[in-house]
């Protein structure tokens, strides 16, 4: 029984890392999407390269760079390093999700708002973003699912970082049996299945 609790404690840490990472990713992603719509050529190039780099480099390598180079000696908390690493990685995907959600709307709405004298930030915040949320939410849930699976490398990349993977590895080392890994896989599968059902339900409700 204590072994199952140990695995569930690892799962709870994994969920926390995922949630905080996606939350940071959404904040940074919204900022990136907003900056992109300022139509500044230099800013556009910087953001495009930022997105391409983060989407092109495996998340494991990114986490290693953050842990042992960029944040080395600056932040001691492995949990915080993981959140920052995954959050920055997620921001590249979230910014594209938001951009796609905004571009799916009728461009005439922004033009009408601007014609009425609304400043660009106000038009985005009060008219465009609220409508785009309908298209964005299901995709954000899918991003949460993707990041949830990607966090499985945390226990392997960051030394002694406790999460579901680390918990299963610790139990496997104790008993020298494959069951802990199998249980971890089953837990990941069940969680992803539940998240996917939630995403599908949310998408159907938003389409009504």
Predicted regions: what they are:
Residues 1-208:
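Transmembrane alpha-helices and adjacent helix-loop boundaries
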